[in-house]
Amino acid sequence: MMLTADYHTHTTFSHGKGGPGENIEAAISSGLEEIGIADHSVRHLAYGVRNIERYFGELEKAKRLYEGRIVVKTGIELNLLGLDGSVDLPEGYGFDVTILGVHKAALYKNVKSAWALLFGADRKKITGAYLQAIRKNRIDIIAHPGYAAPVDYGMLGKACSDYGTLFEINARHRGLAAQDIAQAASEGARFVISSDAHVPGDVGGVSFALELAAAAGLTEKQIVNVKS
């Protein structure tokens, strides 16, 4: 399998080491057809985008600049903020790709949610929070499932299947096992392979994720951004 698109990459707008243009040029050099920039949303205390208007504007400009060479997707990596499924999607911006994950440095909705998502090991509650977020919001991709907080992969896979959300296989965070992916797949989930690149040189670098997908028994039809 060969990667065709990398939708989860970071730039200097959060904690990446290169600008949007550098990531895009790296994607072109890697032979990708599409590239997404998805920096951390506003309630990530350490790395959240500080000027969302400028961020979105720069991505829209890049989309126009590279038209005809590569498809550029404007993205945002949202934080799961509460057990009720609250997320920090900025209003008034039409992002092409919305990615959702649990991040330890997020500004959570309340103490109960912070405790559960930061320190809790209650798989049922955390999975429920993901499910609520998927039901209430347009979530295109679940980022690094199981990273930072335990989840029920079968239940999450079923929700992804029901709502058209993609289950990410992340090349950077390597806690996901082949059996976890297989469990999500058994519930009808579809998948996306991501580099989660924080430097331009890592854009499209997903060999680990591709090997993991193969070990889980996934076919090309189950992964949206690969081809033969």
Predicted feature locations:
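Charged catalytic cores and adjacent phosphate/nucleic-acid-binding surfaces used
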Residues: 1-11, 20, 90, 95, ...
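Glycine-rich anion/phosphate-binding loops
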Residues: 14-20, 83-85
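Short, solvent-exposed loop/turn segments at secondary-structure boundaries
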Residues: 15-18, 46-50, 203-205
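Alpha-helical scaffold segments that flank or form the walls of functional sites
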Residues: 21-36, 57-68
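A structural signal for isolated positions on well-ordered beta-strands in alpha/beta enzyme cores
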Residues: 34-36, 71-73, 192
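Short, conserved active-site loops that position catalytic residues or coordinate cofactors/metal ions
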Residues: 35-46
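Short, ordered loop/turn segments at secondary-structure junctions
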Residues: 40-41, 103, 172, 197
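Extended substrate/RNA-proximal surfaces in nucleic-acid metabolism proteins
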Residues: 45-165, 214-222
